[in-house]
Amino acid sequence: MRPERNNISIYNPQWLAGFTSGEGSFGVKVRNPKENSKAFIELIFQINQHVRDKQLIACIAEYLECGNIYKHSLNAVVYRVSKRSDLTERVIPFFIKYPILGIKALDFKDFCSLAELISNKAHYTEEGLDQIIRIKANMNTGRILEG
């Protein structure tokens, strides 16, 4: 079993981008609207880790200056950012400057598209909501790679 580490700091933003490429996720929750009401769309950036790495998760939250840390289970902690202003002013600009690599880069690109659609209030129209749902369906495990 790996021991807990103390005195963890993040000095290299590229390290955080690489760590996120492997351990982070970009997602969206769509809460179905009732008739004649607006859909609720929640964008989420999160990193899950074993509880022994809770100090690392705290350092990531401190480094990005946003988000919350939750105990997910006996053995897991979650760093989550869902506040739109934190996503658009901190998280998205950070990963534009220090790019995500690999397949997760496609999820980040979709995440940015969703943030823009929401910013433009596209989710208040049926067409916009359909577009958001299509993008969501093709993110993460729903992504089909051509090849």
Model-predicted regions and their roles:
Residues 1-147:
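Sequence-level preference for short, compositionally simple segments enriched
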